[in-house]
Amino acid sequence: MDHVKLVNDPIDIAHIHQLLADEGCGASSVFVGTTRDNFQGKKVLSLAYEAYDSMALKEMNKICSDLRSKWLDLKHIVIYHRLGTVPVCEASVVIAASSPHRSEALESVSFAIDQLKTRVPIWKKEIYEGDNDGEWKENKESIRPKKSKSGFNYAACPCKVEESHDVPRTLVQIRVNDAELTKRLECFVNRKRDEINSQNVIDFKSSFVSSDKDLSDSCARTQSTIIKQEQSNCHLKVRRVNNRCGPQQMEMRPNYELELNKLMGSRDGQTDPIKEMRKSLPNSRLQAIESYMGLTTDNEENIFSRIKRVENRLLQLESISPEYRHFTKREPSSMEAAPPKKIRKKSYSAQELSAFIQKIKDGSEFS
């Protein structure tokens, strides 16, 4: 049976012997680790142990499983470790095992203590005389990445780097020392902070405050109010710019397109571009398109406005039904070869084939 435990009280060795007792075992091996009173000429008063309890118990159980896989005759295994302050001469760890023969017990205990020092997350702190802080110690058996023996020796590198470079003053934009540069950065940050604060006051603070109150220490965090703007879901002010001239004023100027066409099309100021356009462009083609699109035809209307109406109608139809443009089949040109027609062959059943063969036989015999 496995007995694994982390204790805060002194470990009872007699209780350990009771856990190992078994009628079929002829040997019991017990290792007891205690606190010594010196280390490298320093007087040790006590040891302080800390552990990651759940992980430590898990690893200790794994050690027991490893012991039983290597030594199959082990009967009982005990691993007790003490936490907290452990004075001199008191036991901090006890590892014991019982088996029918002494070799398995001795070898398993030696293997277990090495694995405990290597794998279990328990940390030790030595308290010295005259030093209340103490010093954390590392087990020499703990697994740590070894330093590479083939490390690069930078001291033997023949490369030399020139540290002094003369930079032309024309390439230096800021010619101040570190203190002045730090001062400028702080001033810039403070100014930006003040701008943000002032904007927050404008956007968040209520303007309906009595003038007799001192507002020097007020802020948006303590006096914030949300003023809903008209026709808006946001409390911030939204402004719309109305241009006094340009395409946005076409509704206010009915003759804007006509004036623009005259301005862009007239050369000598005497010819009418609309009449010239009517003469050059066959009006019948546009009328056919308008009738196909279901639009009313007005020959007196500007040609560009009529084309624009057709384009808007196409966009409307495609937005309502995106597959609209796929419904119109383009007629093939006379130059293009007509695609071959697919002829579906008739499939015959077995009875029809038998009857057909029989007719052929009857005809041959008849002939």
UniProtKB/Swiss-Prot annotation:
A Pfam family annotated for this UniProt entry: MoaE
Matches recorded under HAMAP family: MOC2B
Gene expressing this chain: Mocs2B
Positions contributing to substrate binding: 101-102, 117, 124-126
Name of this chain's protein: Molybdopterin synthase catalytic subunit
Signal peptide residues on this chain, from the entry's feature table: none
Pathway: Cofactor biosynthesis; molybdopterin biosynthesis
Source species, domain of life: Eukaryota
Job description of the protein: Catalytic subunit of the molybdopterin synthase complex, a complex that catalyzes the conversion of precursor Z into molybdopterin. Acts by mediating the incorporation of 2 sulfur atoms from thiocarboxylated Mocs2A into precursor Z to generate a dithiolene group.
SUPFAM superfamilies according to UniProt: Molybdopterin synthase subunit MoaE
GO cellular component, one term: molybdopterin synthase complex
Catalytic activities: 2 [molybdopterin-synthase sulfur-carrier protein]-C-terminal-Gly-aminoethanethioate + cyclic pyranopterin phosphate + H2O = molybdopterin + 2 [molybdopterin-synthase sulfur-carrier protein]-C-terminal Gly-Gly + 2 H(+)
Key words, A-Z: Cytoplasm, Molybdenum cofactor biosynthesis, Transferase
Chief location: cytoplasm
Gene Ontology MF: a single term: molybdopterin synthase activity
EC number(s) from the headed UniProt entry: 2.8.1.12
Organism (species): Drosophila simulans (Fruit fly)
Single biological process term from Gene Ontology: chromatin remodeling
Residues spanning the membrane: none
Note: This protein is produced by a bicistronic gene which also produces the small subunit (Mocs2A).
Matches recorded under CDD domains: MoaE
Complex formation: Heterotetramer; composed of 2 small (Mocs2A) and 2 large (Mocs2B) subunits.
Family: Belongs to the MoaE family. MOCS2B subfamily.
